[in-house]
Amino acid sequence: MGAYKYMQELWRKKQSDVMRFLLRVRCWQYRQLSALHRAPRPTRPDKARRLGYKAKQGYVIYRVRVRRGGRKRPVPKGATYGKPVHHGVNQLKFARSLQSVAEERAGRHCGGLRVLNSYWVGEDSTYKFFEVILIDTFHKAIRRNPDTQWITKAVHKHREMRGLTSAGKKSRGLGKGHKFHLTIGGSRRAPWRRRNTLQLRRYR
């Protein structure tokens, strides 16, 4: 086994004494820093490389702190107006994961970079911490490499805002396997439209 395989196994056993101590110390360290800051290198190089990171020019890592918990409806004094069934303010759950929220914040802050992917690095009772991989699409090392040219195209601008990253697709219910049957056809709306469209086919 290579070194990265051993690192992967270490991160899988998060309840081991070593990892519990490391994660506690790191969470304390991350809490002292700002909510969004650049990391000098990936905390989990094995995970970052599996998600497409390379230790070369044009790749940037940002660490994002996201507050845990549900999403309160942003209404003044709890006045939602309308019918009582829609009066909920506090116990609402956001449709997207905190990881996709972290990607969005990193993408907003670094408007000139493209979000490639992200991964979990720690959490405590109040916050979750994610590291986001961003790519500088104007760097020659990215533009001249056939493997990374795809992300330089304009269609991939702010892909994190449109649910095109891995975390975003998961929240949209897109994927393979028995967990993702509701989105056969590309979206939640596609199978509904297919089932509810009357097709009177003419046979010759």
UniProtKB/Swiss-Prot annotation:
Stretch forming the signal peptide: none
Keyword field contains Membrane? no
Region (Disordered) residue ranges read 161-180
Q: What superkingdom heads the lineage?
A: Eukaryota
The protein's matches in Pfam families, at most eight in alphabetical order, are given as:
Ribosomal_L15e
Task: Mention any one GO cellular component term assigned to this protein in its UniProt record.
Answer: cytosolic large ribosomal subunit
Keywords, ordered alphabetically: Cytoplasm, Ribonucleoprotein, Ribosomal protein
GO molecular function, one example? Answer: structural constituent of ribosome
Q: What Gene3D superfamilies is this protein classified in?
A: Ribosomal protein l15e (3.40.1120.10)
Q: Name one GO biological process term.
A: cytoplasmic translation
Start-end of Basic residues biased regions: 169-180
Keyword Ribonucleoprotein tagged? yes
Localization of this protein: Cytoplasm
Q: What is its main location?
A: cytoplasm
According to its UniProt entry, the function of this protein is described as:
Component of the large ribosomal subunit. The ribosome is a large ribonucleoprotein complex responsible for the synthesis of proteins in the cell.
Q: Quaternary form?
A: Component of the large ribosomal subunit.
Which family is annotated?
Answer: Belongs to the eukaryotic ribosomal protein eL15 family.
Q: What is this protein called?
A: Large ribosomal subunit protein eL15
Species source reads Ictalurus punctatus
Classification of source organism: Eukaryota, Metazoa, Chordata, Craniata, Vertebrata
What gene is behind this protein? Answer: rpl15
